[in-house]
Regions:
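Bacterial Sec-dependent N-terminal signal peptides
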Residues: 1-5, 14-41, 252-256
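Short beta-strands within extracellular/lumenal beta-sheet-rich domains
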Residues: 131-154
């Protein structure tokens, strides 16, 4: 399924027409957070995390896509929403490295990524989201479609994974019956809300599981959404609300 999803994302389609001064486009956005190698030494450095230097909730965009990945930061420190991570992942989710302050932004595994790269595509960069329990420390929207007045955006899928910090906390504190769930809510401008979810970790009498492979999160049932918000829900309060995201794919149509 992963290969099918990637091929669908690579098949970028665009249709444009001019009719009495109007302009329309329909295409598939494939957000990988990957940049030219020249960008990394300046903006990321070695094994680091990028937080936008401005105080705007809008956060950052990728390439030409009208999608804003929201963040709330104070003094350069992420308080809620998205950051971009250049941190190398743990090897096959074995938590071999000593615990450190970067674990909140380090993917739990590099499994399936060629050359030890962190993302599912063998690239250097992925996004990390923090669901701060304090609403005042969260952006207004987690992902906002910039052309909502002139078009539509339908999220299709993305890859998700746990961070190293979350994996450690799950293994330290989870007991039978505990579950960690990621929810995505799509909201139209008229207030209509739809929701999809995926389990990031679950402990049962039969099996204990913690996600440590990049896994497809099917978001297609959200339908067109002007805003997408994420919630990381844990039955155990000792597990913080972080998760990794990459390969965000959405179908976009705009008319001007």
């Amino acid at each position: 399924m992963k290969k099918v999803l990637l091929f669908a994302a690579i098949a970028f389609s665009m249709i444009s027409c001019l009719d009495k001064g109007s302009f329309s486009q329909s295409y598939t956005a494939d957000v990988t957070f990957e940049f030219s190698d020249l960008v990394y030494p300046k903006e990321f450095g070695e094994d680091s995390v990028y937080v936008c230097p401005n105080e705007q909730d809008l956060g950052f965009t990728y390439m030409q896509y009208p999608l804003f990945f929201g963040q709330k930061q104070v003094g350069g420190e992420l308080k809620g929403g998205f950051a971009m991570s250049y941190l190398k992942g743990e090897k096959d989710g074995k938590l071999e490295k000593e615990a450190n302050s970067n674990d909140a932004f380090r993917v739990h595994a590099a499994a399936g990524a060629p050359g030890g790269a962190a993302s599912p595509f063998g690239s250097k960069t992925y996004a990390v989201f923090y669901d701060n329990p304090s609403e005042s420390m969260m952006p207004k929207y987690d992902i906002e479609f910039g052309y909502k007045d002139n078009g539509s955006c339908a999220p299709l899928a993305c890859y998700v994974n746990n961070t190293t910090l979350v994996a450690r906390k799950v293994k330290e504190h989870f007991q039978d019956g505990d579950k960690l769930t990621l929810k995505a809510r799509g909201t139209k401008f008229d207030g209509t809300v739809s929701e999809v979810s995926i389990v990031l970790a679950e402990y049962t009498e039969a099996k204990d599981s913690v996600m440590y492979n990049w896994t497809v999160f099917d978001m297609s049932k959200l339908g067109p959404a002007d805003f997408v918000d994420f919630e990381v829900e844990s039955t155990n309060p000792n597990v913080p609300g972080y998760f990794c995201l990459d390969g965000y794919i959405a179908s976009i149509s705009v008319v001007f």
